[in-house]
Every structure is written in structure tokens, then in C-alpha cells.
């Protein structure tokens, strides 16, 4: 079994709650992860930014924390192919750990 220690970065409406899109207050724009074996030794890394589909402008705090510009994200792939690659990278026997 592998342990997948992952971190997600999120964006939200640049207008805060007033601009929230239905039941989707946040959108994943980055997936980062480290794969550990059963001895907790690192055996792989995954990192990819994701092109926003819902909130195409960055919230000011997201921009500040990640030091990103939305133009950089526009060049990235969308969520579906990225999450599929991530799940393929995880393998068949894994446990996801996050905070």
C-alpha cells in the first residue's frame, strides 16, 4: 500500500459570497502530492495546476497566497484530465492523507 499525502489549492469568487456559483463555493486549481511506501519513504511526486472553469478570475487572497496570475492558469489543463492522471498516479492500493 502507498500513502498519498496531498494538498489542494482552491479559488473562489473574486466577489466573495456574493459571486458564489450555486453549490460550488470553491474550485480546485492545484493538486500537489507525495507518494510514500509502507516504510514512509518517498517514492513519487505529483503536481499540476488546473485551469479554472467556474471562477475564471482569481480571488485576491488566492492570488496573494499562491503568487499566481490567472493567465498562467489559462494555459493549464482542466480538472477532469488532471484528476484522472492523479488517480492513475496513485495506483491501485493507496490511502489518501490530507490536512
Residue ranges and their predicted role:
Residues 2-99:
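Conserved non-catalytic scaffold segment of RNase H-like nuclease domains
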